[in-house]
Amino acid sequence: MEAQRIQGTYQGLSLNKWWCWDSKSEWLYKCSAQKLVVVISNIESSEVLERWQFDIEGDKTAKDDSAARGKSQKTVQDEIRSVIRQITATVTFLPLLEVSCSFDLLIYTDKDLVVHEKWEESGPQFIISSEEVCLRSFTTTIHKVNSMMAYKTPVND
């Protein structure tokens, strides 16, 4: 697995940073992406403050089957909504980000995958001294997605 990344900033984010969404959709459909990570960092120090990780287990045979894989679209959407509600609820315990931040989008792909030149290889960008929170999982007809997030433990003065 290789991590491919593209960068953006919170302030003045241009939607053209997402030029490659078609690539990501294709990678997900072909089960070529195993992990999607959003890393939030302090712009000035480059210190990683939050890391949102979504591990993706793809079933390459599922998309070739003509029969549906036992889950209705409503069930899948309900599971995804549940994860989104849980992500939204993290504001109750996450430290407030009081610095200007940027984000990196990392996608761990098959090593032999050809990627656009705007993507570059990256390290995992782990957080030193972090707290980790496991979030709910969900499954679709092709994927199982496990999610977790880590955040920088506040330093007591």
Label each region the model flagged.
Residues M1-D157:
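Long protein-protein interaction modules used by eukaryotic assembly/scaffold proteins
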